[in-house]
Amino acid sequence: MRFAVVQFGGSNCDRDVAYILNEVCGIDTDLVWYKEGLSRAYDAVVLPGGFSYGDYLRAGAIAARTRVMDDVRRLARGSGLVLGICNGAQILAESGLVPGVFTVNAYPKFICRPAYLRVERSDTPFTMLYATGDVIRIPIAHREGRYIPPASGSNRRLVTESIAFRFCDAHGNVTPESNPNGSHENITGVLSAAGNVLAMMPHPERASEDILGSCDGRLVFLSMARYLEVNS
């Protein structure tokens, strides 16, 4: 089993994710510069947080049009897993690999703080080590993290089946007050139609060691590894 963490110009969470995967989760992981592409076979790819290309045009818009994303699409069409975190989630949305878009927060400021999430599904490659309804605590750090689903049609209906995480309060209540950025129905983690691509705004790598105050995010990565082990 081998993971790749793709580095774009402006990525700044790439080494954090690689450290958690390699050193904390024990998953062999390579840092891959985007111009090199996925030159070997990988079981999973992570697009990390940061500010790829300075977030010019729109967050993730330029990175989504780089050649390495052709490799990511091929992996997603097969049996591989793709996780996009924060800026990586924006890139996945811009690439059309998940439905909807991530746009400027309802209160248009950068938000950086812990957030509570409710696990909406535990039958996905990214959440299989959680239980549906679990409340987890993972930091957020974004200005363009407000999720908006497709305007109409089948893709809009698909979103209701593709929600992995919602913002909530400490007791699991999904309320307007627990929604830090104005996301539609508090959605902050959305899956592809096939379920093997996840875009999430919170940073699980920042909640993967006790010293960081929470280990809740580690189960995202360990779920991916477990899924690949079971389905290899």
What would you call each of these model-derived segments?
Residues 1-85, 93-99, 104-111, 118, ...:
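N-terminal beta1-alpha1 cap of cysteine-dependent amidohydrolase-like domains
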Residues 4, 47-51, 92, 175, ...:
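Amphipathic, alpha-helical segments enriched in basic
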Residues 73-77, 102-232:
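Amide-donor transfer/coupling interface in amidating biosynthetic enzymes
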Residues 88:
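N-terminal Rossmann-like NAD(P)+-binding domain of SDR-like oxidoreductases, especially those catalyzing
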